[in-house]
Amino acid sequence: MAEVHRRQHARVKGEAPAKSSTHRHEEELGMASAETLTVFLKLLAAGFYGVSSFLIVVVNKSVLTNYRFPSSLCVGLGQMVATVAVLWVGKALRVVKFPDFDRNVPRKTFPLPLLYFGNQITGLFSTKKLNLPMFTVLRRFSILFTMFAEGVLLKKTFSWGIKMTVFAMIIGAFVAASSDLAFDLEGYVFILINDVLTAANGAYVKQKLDSKELGKYGLLYYNALFMILPTLAIAYFTGDAQKALDFEGWADTLFLLQFTLSCVMGFILMYATVLCTQYNSALTTTIVGCIKNILITYIGMVFGGDYIFTWTNFIGLNISIAGSLVYSYITFSEEQLSKQSEASSKLDIKGKGAV
């Protein structure tokens, strides 16, 4: 009887590791499928942002340069109104959810509304003033500023390879700018301000999303809502509102279609930016924007109508483009390695706990 008891006890002890091994294998499969879904969502969010960012630059350029619409402020105002209207209707239909307004909302959003307003208006103004190739190459300064912002706000560090590719992009931008025959000082100043605001906005959006107080829809809604009246007041006192009302192109159906698309794309781009930042990072969002800018650079050379070719400018543009491609590859590779090491360390910890 004692022998039988010992055998049963030994059998039970032998089964425990097998059960533990099976359980661990199931956990590994579950984590692998979750990892695949996460990567897919990240790529989808990045692709959505890239397409949205491309379309809004092309449409805004057409409205402000080709049709010579006189007010960047009023285009920005239209984008804010469209954002608020779409999200308000979405909330009423229970398609989206975000917190109702209370006295703590301004504190929870600050300083994003100011950054959003500045980012939007400087972006529109520089789009109007600069040809598309120079607009896109100067936008690469936003990567440098994003690195600073994430370093200060999110305490991130960057590898030597990342720093060198950013340096190459900036050198390329300086070379291209040195022989820009269509040089416009106001355009250059506004695009550099826009780069700083883009970097700060991306880092703060990531910080606010991590706190989970308002969510992505709440941030979008209140950013636009808080800046409608200030933008309207600025447009009125600067005379931009009157210029927009006096514009002769309102009777043109094609212009109306593009203006409406510009307003709606403003909301879509805001949503895509927050979505990409949420699933990836502020830096990844900036990278996707730069890859999109490569396409816009070459399209702008051929179809933009305001690009003046010089070899020095062309070489500078391509140095910056090459730097952005290598930069994107290094950043993506580093991010994947980081995720894999985190996943393996979690598995090791769980494996030790199961033994």
From Swiss-Prot:
Does this UniProt record's set of keywords contain Membrane?
yes
This enzyme catalyses: UMP(out) + UDP-N-acetyl-alpha-D-glucosamine(in) = UMP(in) + UDP-N-acetyl-alpha-D-glucosamine(out); UMP(out) + UDP-alpha-D-glucose(in) = UMP(in) + UDP-alpha-D-glucose(out)
| Topological domains, Extracellular | 60-68, 178-184, 238-253, 304-314
Instruction: Name a GO CC annotation attached to this entry.
Output: endoplasmic reticulum
**What are the recorded GO MF terms, alphabetically?**
antiporter activity; nucleotide-sugar transmembrane transporter activity; UDP-glucuronate transmembrane transporter activity; UDP-N-acetylgalactosamine transmembrane transporter activity; UDP-N-acetylglucosamine transmembrane transporter activity
Comp. bias intervals (Basic residues)? 1-11
User: What are the entry keywords?
Assistant: Antiport, Golgi apparatus, Membrane, Sugar transport, Transmembrane, Transmembrane helix, Transport
Pfam families in the record, alphabetically?
Answer: TPT
Q: Which residues cross the membrane?
A: 39-59, 69-89, 157-177, 185-205, 217-237, 254-274, 281-303, 315-335
Known role: Nucleotide sugar antiporter transporting UDP-N-acetylglucosamine (UDP-GlcNAc) and UDP-glucose (UDP-Glc) from the cytosol into the lumen of the Golgi in exchange of UMP. By supplying UDP-N-acetylglucosamine, a donor substrate to heparan sulfate synthases, probably takes part in the synthesis of these glycoconjugates.
Enumerate the PANTHER family for this protein.
SOLUTE CARRIER FAMILY 35 (PTHR11132)
- What name does the UniProt record give this protein? Nucleotide sugar transporter SLC35D2
Say which species the protein is native to. Answer: Bos taurus
